[in-house]
Amino acid sequence: MPKKNKNKKNDNEKSILGRNAIFTPNVINDIHIKSQLGRYRMRGMALMKKIPHWDDLTFLPGTLTRFVIEGYREKCETKTVIGPNCKNPIKLDIPIYITSMSFGALSYEAKTALARGATMAGSATCSGEGGMIPDERRYSELWYYQCIQSRYGFNPHHAQLADGIEVFIGQGQKVGMGGHLMGQKVTDQVAEMRSLPSGIDQRSPARHPDWLGPDDLALKVEELRQLTKNKVPIQLKLGASKVYDDVRMAAKCDPDSI
């Protein structure tokens, strides 16, 4: 029998050369794919990298600018009012709400369960991209309707049923990028709500077609305010980027919350 060449390495051994705690086999493979594509990968699901956990959060204690309370005998008030100048401001028991996640990215069961949970916690939830699920609206005591770049599923009559309008500009997981819903998640029901063919990838643009700058955005905020007859707060949702500059510009557009 011919002798095996000990110096010859198989493909699997070659692919893992140079790996370490940072450059794992998955990371190296991802780099190879991106170099072949010439762009970032388009895929579903969450980020591959590790992100901070709830246990990593630290609440800033009170000193001079915030009056200190005696935690063992005084109650810390968490109630939050959004849009106090509106006819129907949103009143939360906690300063946290369930952010926008679309029907499609999440299942019907997940959306309705989050709606029930938000109501139990005295908080709010949001429609996300793609329009309204009637049962989500029914189970949500406080509910935001989202105005998004693609306009998929946007219905002004549904917006008038909301407790607040959220204008989507960015989100933490992918700041400055549009949406991408994998084809296997575009079921017949999702496709019908968004007026799209089922089973194909759905892309949303990174920019809104209704404005090019802060002046246009201010007009959009006013348009939504007139749509809802100034009954509910108009909220701008930003992904954290140039926070100081972005928040200053957003504030000039006169929303009820950012």
Predicted regions and their residues:
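Active-site loop/lid in soluble adenylation, ligation, and acyl-transfer enzymes
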Residues: Y145-G153
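Charge-rich, low-complexity amphipathic helices
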Residues: E136-E141, D246-A250
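Conserved, well-structured core domains of diverse proteins
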Residues: M1-I96, S100, A105-T119, S123-A124, ...
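Alpha/beta enzyme core
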Residues: R116, Y152-I258
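General beta-strand structural signal in soluble alpha/beta enzymes
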Residues: T125-G128, Y145, V167, L236
